[in-house]
């Protein structure tokens, strides 16, 4: 149990059988009446946010999230098969759990998989990946002065904007949080 007076951004609590992460909170002490805490909570599974008001000193259960390191193996058509790096157990993760991050998955990539009450509620991908460019328009000498960009298709199928000097066969570092080209490797 955690007192609402001890809320900090990032603390995970359990409400109505679901895990919520504290996004914002504010202690309010009105001139008349007792103090209360107004919090903005993000549902860890769905990503939706909700505002909730708690009485001062109220205690709520802390949600115990289990984060396990898993290695992505392959896509079986229904989901993404990953292997636990500790006990080598293989599980299939639904496409909904990975969401938009699926376009960055590569074989043998290490993922952080979040479990709540034995169910997968989220997948943390690494912030940066290194991928090979499989298709892009050839760069023309002297095109680098304008800072122009072109599309490049990566080995995972993702398409990113890259500078004109990048060619097919180059290995790039990509920030997958934003989908932006960082550098040639």
Curated annotation (Swiss-Prot):
InterPro entries: Elong-fact-P_C, NA-bd_OB-fold, Rib_uL2_dom2, Transl_elong_fac_P/YeiP, Transl_elong_KOW-like, Transl_elong_P/YeiP_cen, Transl_elong_P/YeiP_CS, Transl_elongation_fac_P. One of its GO terms (cellular component) is cytoplasm. GO terms for biological process: peptide biosynthetic process. One of its GO terms (molecular function) is translation elongation factor activity. Pathway: Protein biosynthesis; polypeptide chain elongation. It is found in: Cytoplasm. Coiled coil: none annotated. The keyword Cytoplasm applies. Keywords: Cytoplasm, Elongation factor, Protein biosynthesis. It comes from the Bacteria. SMART domains: EFP, Elong-fact-P_C. HAMAP family: EF_P. Involved in peptide bond synthesis. Stimulates efficient translation and peptide-bond synthesis on native or reconstituted 70S ribosomes in vitro. Probably functions indirectly by altering the affinity of the ribosome for aminoacyl-tRNA, thus increasing their reactivity as acceptors for peptidyl transferase. Belongs to the elongation factor P family. This is Elongation factor P. It comes from Syntrophomonas wolfei subsp. wolfei (strain DSM 2245B / Goettingen).
